[in-house]
A protein has these predicted regions:
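Glycine-rich, acidic loop regions that bind phosphate or pyrophosphate groups
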Residues: 1-16, 208
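Short secondary-structure junctions and interdomain/linker hinges
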Residues: 4, 8, 21-36, 53, ...
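Helix N-terminus capping/helix-initiation residues
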Residues: 7, 38, 242-244
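Short, isolated positions within intrinsically disordered regulatory regions of eukaryotic proteins
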Residues: 8, 14-17, 25, 75, ...
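Short coil/turn segments at secondary-structure boundaries
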Residues: 12-13, 59-60, 218-219
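Active-site diphosphate/adenylate-binding microenvironment
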Residues: 16-94, 98
Length: 276
């Protein structure tokens, strides 16, 4: 395959598509949303603050998908993101491991508040062992990725936000008094609270200059989505429901399935008498 190349027409299509997507990325990075920034703008600020040898780490929630779509990797070892099992809690521990593997690189860990709550204990390990990492703690007061997924199949975001129960017994009361910045400080990390993108950019500069693990805490608006990839995730929808939203989601799901192409099929595919 050494000398094999696609034809020029197809290569030009690829270049055009790549340029168009790059324009979408730039627009997502430039979003100036208030009062809370979009997650894509936070990612863009980190990309602008990193150099070619820095490493980013991520794992669960909406961050891996957004990083996969938006982040422009500049080094083969500069991008360490776990996708397959969406392992909540992997991020900080993985960042510690990456830094141990190559102490010469600055490591930026992207983690949402849901994953942070699952496992943050390696912060104290990083302090104990004098292994500095930078943790970008993106707070949206809940499990927003799975919340959005549940909405996409026609059901509400049940139990996916950090709320008190209301008088009706539902998890729709006031926000819980969660202060993950204080928690990170209690584990020995330097903590910088950023209230907007300008403060966030300054915090990234300070975090790089610090000599111990630093957590940069910023809230974002979970309703501002990154550009759509155009791909489709086969997540089945309940076939029987009293909810209008679920029935409508089922129609969309069944329509989307018609576009599936099966490249690998058993030899008895479509045989009604087959036991499989």
């Amino acid at each position: 395959l050494k000398d094999w190349r696609v034809d020029e027409e197809y290569a030009e299509q690829c270049r055009t598509a790549a340029a168009a997507w790059n324009d979408s990325v730039e627009a997502a990075y430039a979003l100036d949303h208030h009062p809370l920034p979009a997650q894509s703008a936070i990612i863009g600020a980190v990309e602008a603050a990193t150099n070619d040898r820095d490493v980013i780490v991520g794992a669960a929630g909406s961050l891996p998908g957004d990083l996969h779509k938006l982040w422009r990797t500049r080094d083969p070892k500069g991008y360490h993101v776990e996708y397959a099992f969406s392992c909540m809690g992997y991020e900080i521990a993985a960042g510690l491991g990456v830094k141990m593997a190559d102490p010469s690189r600055e490591v930026f860990v992207f983690v949402g508040d849901g994953s942070y709550l699952m496992m943050n204990s390696e912060i104290i390990t990083s302090i104990q062992e004098d292994i500095k990492i930078i943790v970008i703690l993106v707070v949206n007061h809940g499990f927003q990725s799975i919340g959005a997924l549940s909405e996409s199949v026609g059901v509400e975001r049940f139990g996916t936000t950090y709320r008190y129960r209301d008088q009706a017994g539902q998890l729709a009361g006031d926000k819980l008094p969660l202060d993950l910045a204080a928690n990170a400080a209690s584990l020995g990390a330097q903590v910088i609270r950023a209230n907007n993108l300008e403060e966030f950019r300054a915090a990234l500069v300070q975090a790089r200059a610090n000599t111990i693990t630093t957590v940069v805490h910023i809230e974002d608006d979970p309703t501002i989505a990154a550009p759509d990839s155009g791909s489709w995730w086969d997540v089945p929808v309940a076939e029987v429901s009293t909810r209008t939203s679920t029935r409508e989601a089922l129609v969309r799901y069944e329509e989307a399935r018609t576009a599936q192409r099966h490249f690998l099929r058993p030899t008895n595919w479509g045989d009604p008498d087959s036991p499989s």
